Structures are given as C-alpha cells and as structure tokens.
C-alpha cells in the first residue's frame, strides 16, 4: 500500500475535524442607528429570534442620539449603513457624494387636533399651528404646497410655531396651539390622548402627485460598499423584512419591540404598532422612485437650493436598484 493511500483516511479525518471547528464566519455589517428609532425595535427582534445568525450576518450596532449623528457616521466612514431620508441622499449626490438608499419606511405624520371643526387645510386659517421641525421640514413644505394649490398661504393666514417634536406635542396637550403637524410617533402619542388625525400627510403626498404611500426613510450606504457587499446587503434586507413581519404578526416579537418604546398605556402601544405596520414599504423600488421624483420637484420649487442643493431633479441613483429580489 502506498504512503498516499495509507494517509488518505487520516487526511480526510483531519479535514473533517478542521471544517467542523471552523464554521463559515458571519459577514460583519456596521450599523449606526438612532436609539429611539424603530430600527431599534427591529434589531431587538433580530437578536431575540436569531435572525442575524440565520442570515449569516454579524451586526455591529452603534446607537446614536439623533439622525444627524447617523449622517456624520456614514460620511466619516465609521458605519456601513444608517437610516436617513431620500431627500438628504439626493442632496448629497448632487454635491458629489455616492450614497444610495433602500426603502425602510413610508411612515409619515399628520396634523393632529382636538378641535372637531378642523378637518381640512382651509380650517387652519386664523388658527395657531405647531410645526415639528423647522421651516424646511419636508412634511411642512408639502403641506404648504398643498395649501397654496387651494389658494391658502398658511404662513400668512395662520400663526405658525416651529419647535422640536416634544415641544410641539406639549404645546398641543396644553391647548396653546389649535393643531400640530407632528412626526408619526408623536402623532401616535397624541392619538392615544384623544387627538384626531385631521390632515394625513400621506393624503397630501397623493394630492401633490404621488400614486401611493411614499417611502420617506431608507437604509443608506455607499455605492462602493454596495458593489462589494451585494449579497450581504440582500440578506440584511431579507432579515429586516422578517423582523418587520414578526413585529406585525407575533405578539412575542411585538413585546420585544415595545420594550424599546418606554412606558405607554396599552391603547397607545396598539396605535404605535398599527402605525408602524402601516409604514412598511409594499411597492417596487421603481414605483417608490417615481413618486419620490414627483415630490422632489414640489420640494425643489418651494424649498429651493437651501433645501435640495444644486440638484433640480431627483438623481436616478438615489434609490438602490440591486436588491429587488430582497423585497419583503
């Protein structure tokens, strides 16, 4: 018997032992996510249900205090993926950056009020309206544009108060303003306290040319990173899609997510869940891009270069096209 034949079983055994001791290493993705955002809900569910392991991913998640910190992280190269909005991505691309976005949420807010007489844009004339964010907040600009099409200049015909979302919510609760244009989660809080959703920003979007619920935020990453990590990104999108589905349908998953919200009564938590589920993207990237382009034109017209930068139309590479198979 030759030496090779005598050693064959030993070599085979060694190879099997080595393979068993050296599993395929999970691919690492660095995420920088806002601590209070719904992405934190999803990451909690991902960990609790082992979805990251199923996807062969090693997630390095850094929690941030604000969306602005995420922008700094992706620009500085300290994160592979952050969450931001397509308007910011489009502006960055217009200024030379190579960022792109994959749909995350269509969740938008509403004009919230306790006053049953406020039901339409025209009912805001002569009223005090709180606006979460500032004069260049996207929802506010869209609301202004929609009002102008109806012959109403809200800046002239209503008293506008700008402020951070918590401040505007507090002013609404104290009765210091007649209505509040709030982000979706603060709108959910007010809804739980008896406020009604007088004007849906999703309806405003449709009135301005959108065909459906428009993605507002997305996973943002660099073109170069996407080219080198396409498969890992696809698995990441499938994984987060599973987390979204679990939060929608599985009470254990929802309980895991709800722990991230803080103390809320059961009715408010149910509203949070309902609004979160409603914000899950359901359309193709092409459909999302078409609607975003329509709204971009409106925003560019009313917000000008201060809002959109030098780009007059939506950059066609704003939305990432490499993961259609990962749509959930």
Q: What positions do the PLM features span?
A:
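Secondary-structure end/capping motifs
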Residues: 226-305
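Short, glycine-/small- and polar/acidic-enriched structural segments
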Residues: 27-155, 159-162, 171-174, 178-184, ...
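Sec/Tat signal peptide C-region and signal peptidase I cleavage site
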Residues: 20-26
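Conserved C-terminal helix/tail region of periplasmic/extracytoplasmic solute-binding proteins
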Residues: 293-328
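Short, solvent-exposed loop/beta-turn-alpha elements that line the ligand-binding surface or hinge
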Residues: 50, 54, 202-212, 278-288
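Bacterial N-terminal signal peptides
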Residues: 9-19
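Pocket-lining segment of extracytoplasmic ligand-binding domains
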Residues: 86-88, 166-259
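Bacterial N-terminal signal peptides that target proteins for export
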Residues: 1-11
